[in-house]
From Swiss-Prot:
It comes from Francisella tularensis subsp. novicida (strain U112). It holds the Pfam family UPF0004. The keyword ATP-binding does not apply. [4Fe-4S] cluster 1 binds at C14, C50, C79. This is Ribosomal protein uS12 methylthiotransferase RimO. GO terms for cellular component: cytosol. The gene is rimO.
Length: 439
């Protein structure tokens, strides 16, 4: 009897890395490998690493060490794979190291260290591939890499320049996901609004219709699938204005994830971020005029080198004026290889924490005030989880992305016969800082 090699797999980092993991696992399953969820039951372990922040590097190295201790045969891939010397210095026992998207060499290493009898196992793999997210939503990666040169970021060094997929290729994947039961698509990349620039907006045919490989045509085509489609990592370029009418028409979700990072012109200049505070505010107001129920999410960095008290006050003032719906904020931390590491006027950890607390305190109040408008309304939600012991469900409205935004806590889940991955209409009875309560 032929023994099927068992592979343990760990995926670290961002949603983009998760999509890479799905592709690797799909390839392994197609070749007949068995994927297991424990180190000790595996013939070998693959760790798909993150190498962006120093904290992520530390986590990746720690997980590699755990896999070596519990299994002994470990392959490392992903963003930290670009720092092979660091990995080898810390963990010389690692069998193979490959970088992000280096699928061919990774699979070759798998063949070397856990060979499998040649056969055709493609029938074991569903048409949409193997997904690591819950069945009802999926990330849809439309490009790799980035053409921006932000001083706090090393993504272009890790993943290279922008490499867009053709629109017909993306739409074929999106259609497979829909046919597999996916209800929500989360469109991701490093810079979603730059999609297609590198391939000169190459045209493609889908459903007997010609589309250009740009974000407007892509959003239009995805809207025709009649799914929840959510856009992430959208820079506030002028052409984004053309997407918002699609939201007002109900073609795609009224949700924009726009990573602004700061508002102070001086800080943005040092970050090498394209932005102008008043233009950004004007654009936000314009979006709300076109689509009044649009939800705008953003992320910010406090404590960037040289950030003065005046710069921070500028950010607080911007937050008051912008009244953003969903906000994440991080304390600046050095990323090995980033240009910002060379900057003077570093901010102390104590001041960074104070600014983070003050900024998020303000945003918590803004969120509290904005969520109160939902009380007494009926909202469609998608169910993410059900707690049978305590008889409640966790869902999300169209205004909330999974993992990063708020939730709707729904009582009497069993009596309502709520099911994970299905839609339900609920009445909102209460609101908190970030979540809604429904009876």
């Amino acid at each position: 009897m032929i023994k099927i090699p068992k592979i343990g797999f760990v995926s670290l980092g961002c949603p983009k890395n998760l999509v890479d993991s799905e592709r690797i696992i799909t390839k392994l399953k197609a070749e007949g490998y068995d994927l297991v969820d424990s180190y000790d039951n595996a013939d070998m372990v693959i760790v798909n690493t993150c190498g962006f922040l120093n904290s992520a590097i530390d986590e990746s190295l720690e997980v590699i060490g755990e896999a070596i201790a519990e299994n002994g045969k470990v392959l490392v891939t992903g963003c930290l794979g670009n720092k092979a010397d660091l990995i080898k210095e810390k963990h010389p026992e690692v069998l193979s190291i490959t970088g992000p998207q280096d699928y061919e060499n990774l699979i070759e290493a798998v063949h070397t260290h856990a060979p499998i009898f040649a056969n055709d196992f493609v029938s074991l793999v569903p048409p949409q591939g193997i997904k690591l997210t819950p069945r009802h939503y999926s990330y849809l990666k439309i490009s790799e890499g980035c053409n921006n040169t932000c001083t706090f970021c090393i993504i272009p060094d890790i993943r290279g320049k922008l490499k867009s997929r053709s629109i017909d290729n993306i739409m074929k994947e999106a259609e497979k996901l829909k046919n597999a039961g996916v209800k929500e698509l989360l469109v991701i990349s490093q810079d979603t609004s730059a999609y297609g620039v590198d391939i000169k907006y190459k045209s493609g045919i889908w459903n007997n219709k010609e589309y250009q490989s740009n974000i407007i045509d892509l959003a239009t085509a995805l809207g025709d699938l009649d799914m929840w489609t959510r856009l992430h990592y959208v820079y506030p370029y002028p052409h984004v204005d053309k997407i918002v009418p699609l939201m007002a028409q109900g073609k795609i979700l009224p949700y924009l994830d726009v990573p602004l990072q700061h508002s102070s012109p001086e800080v943005l200049k040092r970050m090498k971020r394209p932005a102008h505070t008043q233009k950004t505010l004007d654009r936000i107001n314009k979006w709300r005029d076109i689509c009044p129920d649009i939800t705008i999410r953003s992320t910010f960095i406090v404590g960037f080198p040289g950030e003065t008290e005046a710069d921070f006050e500028h950010l607080l003032d911007f937050a008051e004026k912008a009244q953003l719906d969903r906000v994440g904020c991080f304390k600046y931390s050095e990323v090995e290889g980033a240009k910002a590491n060379q900057f003077d006027n570093l901010i102390s950890e104590e001041v960074k924490q104070q600014r983070l607390d003050e900024f998020m305190g303000l945003q918590a109040q803004i969120s509290t005030d904005k969520l109160q408008r939902f009380v007494g309304t009926e909202q469609q939600v998608i169910i993410d989880a059900i707690n049978k012991d305590e008889n409640y469900a966790i869902g999300r409205t169209k205004y909330d992305a999974p993992e990063v935004d708020g939730q709707v806590i729904i009582g009497d889940a069993l009596e309502r016969n709520l099911k994970v991955g299905e839609f339900a209409t609920v009445e909102i009875t209460e609101s908190t800082e970030y979540d809604l309560i429904a009876d």
